[in-house]
Amino acid sequence: CLLRWPGVVEPNSVSNEIVGSHDFLPTLVSAAGEPDVMEKLKSGYEANGKTYKVHIDGYDMTPYLTGETEEHSRPGFLYFSDDGDILAMRYHNWKIVFMEQETKGTLYLWMHPFLTLRTPKIFNLRTDPFEYADITPNTYYDSILRHEYLFVPAQKLVGDFLETFKEFPPRQKAASFSLSDVLDKLQSSGRSN
């Protein structure tokens, strides 16, 4: 992302930290003078005469951007499919892949399901930005065994995310183009004969 904030963000500075689009809401609202909006939204926040009680998976980047702290506030990033499945996660330099698309192509790959891996793949995105390590060297799987410790913070990050569903369950299921999913939805709504 590119950011210009005269007098706050140092010109020509570069950060390799992770920022998601949903981080813009808490960051911009905080910059406008309303800090902690994410916590306020969880307990019920009134704006423009309406009360919003919702959990948004965004992080306020203002303390990091202003130099108030050197610690980035986002612990990691989850990658989702358009069906709502957690495909992978990013944790610092590492990407941990739980499901992958084996089909190659454009729309053709979208027509085929993801493969759920029995053991996650691990990539160091600083040294392997194109994620080729699993297909090029003979020592890739030895490397996974040496980096098993990454599964602990991965489990915590995913667990913390899933924990939010207790108080804030998903509002809707992801749309599907699968015929069986569409038929199930029609049958559960009582619209089929």
Model feature map: region roles:
Residues L2-L3, T119:
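Catalytic cores of eukaryotic secretory-pathway lumenal/extracellular enzymes that build
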Residues W5, E34, G67, D160-E167:
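A structural signal for alpha-helix termini and helix-coil/disorder junctions
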Residues V8-S13, E17, H22-Y132:
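C-terminal cap/loop subdomain of S1 sulfatases and analogous C-terminal strand-loop tails that border
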Residues I96-V97, E102-T103, M111-K121, L125-N193:
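Long, internal low-complexity/basic segments
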